[in-house]
């Protein structure tokens, strides 16, 4: 009986410590954001409440824009710390890394994948020289048969990949990070003949992305060449706008 109680106590203590660690990381960004805005704009915003509403998000972004004008160093650190923490927790914020359009872009896909961030290293002095190197691992679990060209997969097959990712600041002078990248606007689109208004809250960072995918075994490497051939070797890099605000949302909400 004593042993059972002891185990329960240890389990509870471990859970408490784990929750405390996660909570402190989340409240750390929340507190840092609130303090930064207060120091640079003299506004005391309850960011936890504000980030849940459209007007609140706009207020935070407008305040961060002012913060970047007054204190670019600490504002840069806050935004990139949020990116790093979110990425390491699996919130990548880059649709290209979700394999959304690899196969069956308009119907259900015959596989599910598990993804894990194995390594993430970020170096920078400012947004101009930001450099990220990351390694992601993917496990593809096929729940249906699939055939395309020379590639076939059977229900129950598993494929394992490593993705080596590099992200750098866009070298185009017109794409450099400035206060103009703190965006709050409305976008109007027509859907089924009806005009729909979307509120967009963006802190836009223009990056250059490149990656290389390798199979972890011979079967997986073969599937890379056949199934992911147009996707696997993006070594030359291409431009992608990344919304830094979503990382703050993820950590604070």
Swiss-Prot record:
InterPro entries: Lipoprotein_3. It holds the Pfam family Lipoprotein_3. Belongs to the MG439/MG440 family. This is Uncharacterized protein MPN_505. It comes from Mycoplasma pneumoniae (strain ATCC 29342 / M129 / Subtype 1) (Mycoplasmoides pneumoniae).
């Amino acid at each position: 009986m004593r042993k059972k109680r002891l185990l329960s106590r240890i389990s509870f203590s471990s859970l408490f410590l784990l929750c405390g660690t996660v909570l402190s990381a989340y409240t750390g960004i929340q507190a840092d954001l609130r303090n930064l805005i207060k120091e640079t704009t003299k506004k005391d915003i309850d960011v936890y409440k504000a980030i849940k509403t459209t007007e609140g998000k706009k207020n935070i972004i407008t305040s961060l824009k002012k913060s970047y004008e007054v204190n670019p160093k600490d504002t840069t650190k806050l935004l990139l710390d949020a990116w790093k923490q979110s990425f390491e927790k699996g919130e990548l914020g880059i649709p290209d890394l979700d394999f959304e359009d690899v196969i069956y872009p308009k119907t259900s896909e015959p596989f599910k994948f598990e993804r894990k961030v194995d390594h993430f290293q970020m170096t920078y002095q400012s947004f101009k020289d930001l450099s990220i190197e990351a390694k992601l691992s993917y496990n593809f679990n096929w729940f249906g048969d699939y055939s395309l060209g020379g590639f076939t997969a059977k229900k129950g097959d598993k494929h394992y990949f490593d993705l080596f990712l590099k992200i750098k600041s866009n070298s185009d002078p017109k794409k450099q990070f400035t206060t103009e990248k703190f965006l709050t606007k409305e976008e109007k689109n027509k859907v089924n003949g009806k005009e729909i208004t979307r509120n967009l809250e963006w802190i836009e960072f223009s990056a250059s992305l490149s990656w290389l995918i390798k199979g972890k075994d011979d079967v997986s490497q073969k599937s890379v060449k056949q199934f992911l051939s147009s996707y696997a070797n993006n070594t030359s890099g291409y431009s992608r706008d990344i919304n830094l605000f979503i990382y703050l949302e993820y950590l604070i909400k």
